UniProtKB/Swiss-Prot annotation:
Presence of keyword Transferase: yes
Catalytic activity: guanosine(1207) in 16S rRNA + S-adenosyl-L-methionine = N(2)-methylguanosine(1207) in 16S rRNA + S-adenosyl-L-homocysteine + H(+)
Gene that produces this protein: rsmC
Family designation: Belongs to the methyltransferase superfamily. RsmC family.
Coiled coil: none
Known role: Specifically methylates the guanine in position 1207 of 16S rRNA in the 30S particle.
UniProt xrefs under InterPro entries: DNA_methylase_N6_adenine_CS (IPR002052), Mtase_sm_N (IPR013675), rRNA_ssu_MeTfrase_C (IPR023543), RsmC/RlmG (IPR046977), SAM-dependent_MTases_sf (IPR029063), Small_mtfrase_dom (IPR007848)
Keyword field contains Hydrolase: no
Subunit field text: Monomer.
EC number(s) on file: 2.1.1.172
Name of this protein: Ribosomal RNA small subunit methyltransferase C
GO MF terms, alphabetically ordered: 16S rRNA (guanine(1207)-N(2))-methyltransferase activity; nucleic acid binding
Keywords from the UniProt entry: Cytoplasm, Methyltransferase, rRNA processing, S-adenosyl-L-methionine, Transferase
Amino acid sequence: MSAFTPASEVLLRHSDDFEQSRILFAGDLQDDLPARFECAASRAHTQQFHHWQVLSRQMGDNVRFSLVAQASDVADCDTLIYYWPKNKPEAQFQLMNILSLMPSGVDVFVVGENRSGVRSAEPMLADYAPLNKVDSARRCGLYHGRLEKQPQFSLESCWAEYNIDGLTIKTLPGVFSRDGLDVGSQLLLSTLTPHTKGKVLDVGCGAGVLSAALASHSPKVRLTLCDVSAPAVEASRATLAANGLEGEVFASNVFSEVKGRFDMIISNPPFHDGMQTSLDAAQTLIRGAVRHLNSGGELRIVANAFLPYPKILDETFGFHEVIAQTGRFKVYRTVMTRQAKK
C-alpha cells in the first residue's frame, strides 16, 4: 500500500481544502492515504481485514474493521471521504450505514474510478446528500455534497438467501456470488466426494457454500472457514447456522490468523482486489499451504484456466493434477509430500 491509487491521487489535488477537516475514510481503501493525509483528524472504517492490517499499523485504534460502522467510528467527524467499490450493492450498504450515523451538514465526498461505476453515487445519494462532480482526472470522478437527510439503515433488510441442493445459503452485499452459485465454485463442488473426513480449511469462504455443501454429505469433517471480508465472515456463520452445521469462522488475510494444520484446504481464490487484478492472495495461498497441511494433506482450488497457477503449484509442491475442467475453469489438486517446499 505504498503507492497511491488513481482515486487517492485525485483527492490529493484538493488536499489544501481538507487541512481543517475531521475525516472518516471508508469504502474501498486500497492504499494508506487515510494514515498520511494532512487534516485535523482522521479515522477509517473498513470491511476488509487486509486493509485494516495495513492501516492499523499507522492509525492504531483510529481504524476499525467490522461489518457495520458504529457511532463511535464517526464521532467528531465533519467529513466523509468514501472510496467507491466495484460492487454497487456494497456501496449502498456501506453508505447508508455510515450516513445514518452522521449528523446533517457534514461534507460527503465520493471518489472512484469511472469503470467502477462511481457515477451511480449521484442517483444513490440524491435524496440524502445531493452530489456535484468537482473533479475528473486519472479516469476517476470526485463528487461532493452535504448531508441533508439521514438515511434509514437496517442490517436485517440487507440479508439475502438462495438454495442449493436443499441447503440455505445466506449472503450480504459485497460477498462473492451473492446472487447464486458461481460456475467455478460449482465445478469445485462437483469434485468433493461424500464421506470426506478430517480437518478442512476453506480459504476465502465467501458465503460458506463450499463448506456447507461438503459438510452436508460428509458429517465427520471439522470445518474452519476464513475470509478477508467482514460480510463474508458473517454470511458464512449464518449459512452454517441456517443448515445446522458447525464450524469455526473468522477473518484472516489468507493464512495470517490461521493456526495449525489441516487434512484438506479448499478455495476459490480471488484474482482481484477491488478494481485491480492481483494474484497475491492465490500465490500466498499456494505457497503458504505447505505450512498448514498435514503429511498427505491435499490442496484443492478452482481457478480461471488462463491464470498461471500450475507453475506455482509445481514450484511449491513438485506436481499438480487437473481433476476437472470446463472451457473457462480448472480444478487443481496437489498433495503435501516430502518434496514440497516447506
